[in-house]
Regions:
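Non-catalytic cap/lid and distal C-terminal segments of serine-dependent acyl enzymes
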Residues: 1-318
């Protein structure tokens, strides 16, 4: 016997999407996902922001606001924001815009830069437009847009605690951006999830930023989760030239050398993962890590959170 049904498009009232325009940068697609309880009077929440929102927002949303999370998740309620690029601009535009936004000044004449140029030219030949060029150098402007324009504007519409301990997520070139922000004293973020950072890009920019920060500060109050895939390190020349593995271990070593009093790091080379497979696993592990709720790393905190969750369920059942 056939079952009758009337399918309808699934939607959620807790997910908004819109476009904004940043002077000197262009259009951005913004996704916002709200936690349960966001409409309670006086409620305020920290922000979890993913650059490359086209690629990473959905993953973060599932981990934080998906069905499993709403039933038995232990992560604290947060507002998830994705900052991405309009799909109608095409892949070549996406490729050069993110390269510009995520890096500081970089001539891109080195072998890695030339390889990125070659990929861009292939994308440009496929879908244009003809007047765009591959470039870098927009880190300061893009960070200023996030810090001074986007976050305050979002807080006028959504229940964001602007003084909260916000999280930044980035992958690949976005991971490079995360590390630049990590050592940026003006960054509005204090939790960082850095996935497969392109450590070999931009003429040692990460090393220079770290040294500059260390010369002027005696502490770094952050929670950092940094990782890459085991397969990214030694199985393919282009991936190896990006220095994903070197970025993870160098940052871990510098944290050990500097011994910042309030700097916390959790790092991992993830087995059986490559540059295209690591993201969801890394985001899930990273969110638990920077909130001190990762099993095997924060066992006491996990047990306490489990007990609190059980107690909350008991109260609701009475």
């Amino acid at each position: 016997m056939a079952i009758e049904f009337d399918p309808k498009s699934a939607s959620t009232r807790r997910h908004d999407q819109f476009e904004v325009v940043a002077d000197g940068l262009g259009r951005y697609t913004i996704d916002v996902s709200l936690p349960l309880g966001h409409d309670k009077e006086g409620a305020r929440f920290p922000l979890i922001l993913a650059v490359d929102g086209n690629l990473l927002f959905d993953m973060a949303q599932v981990v934080l606001h998906g069905g499993f999370a709403t039933v038995s998740g232990m992560l604290p309620p947060s507002i998830v924001v994705g900052v991405g690029y309009p799909a109608d601009e095409g892949r070549a535009s996406f490729y050069t815009r993110r390269n510009y936004d995520f890096h500081g000044p970089w001539a891109m004449t080195d072998p890695l830069g030339q390889r990125l140029h070659a990929i861009f030219n292939m994308l440009k030949a496929a879908d244009g437009p003809a007047d765009i060029e591959m470039r870098a150098g927009g880190y300061e402007r893009f960070m200023g847009f996030l810090r001074d324009e986007l976050l305050p504007s979002l807080a006028t519409r959504y229940p964001i605690d602007l003084k909260g301990r916000h999280t930044l997520i980035g992958d690949s070139s976005g991971g490079h951006f995360v590390l630049r922000a990590l050592y940026d004293a003006a960054s509005p973020f204090r939790r960082y999830i850095c996935i497969s950072p392109s450590f070999g890009a931009a003429d040692d920019a990460i090393q220079k930023s770290e040294a500059e920060y260390a010369s002027a500060h005696d502490d770094l109050d952050v929670d950092l989760f940094i990782c890459c895939g085991r397969v990214e390190i030694d199985q393919e020349p282009f991936a190896a030239s990006c220095r994903f593995g070197s970025g993870v271990t160098w940052i871990a070593e510098q944290f050990a050398i500097r011994r910042w009093p309030n700097a916390r790091i959790d790092w991992e080379i993830m087995n059986n993962e490559d540059h295209g497979s690591i993201q969801l696993r890394a985001i899930a592990a990273g969110l638990r890590s920077v909130h001190h709720l990762r099993p095997g790393v924060h066992d006491a905190e996990v047990k306490r959170a489990q007990a609190e969750l059980l107690e909350e369920i008991k109260k609701k059942s009475k």
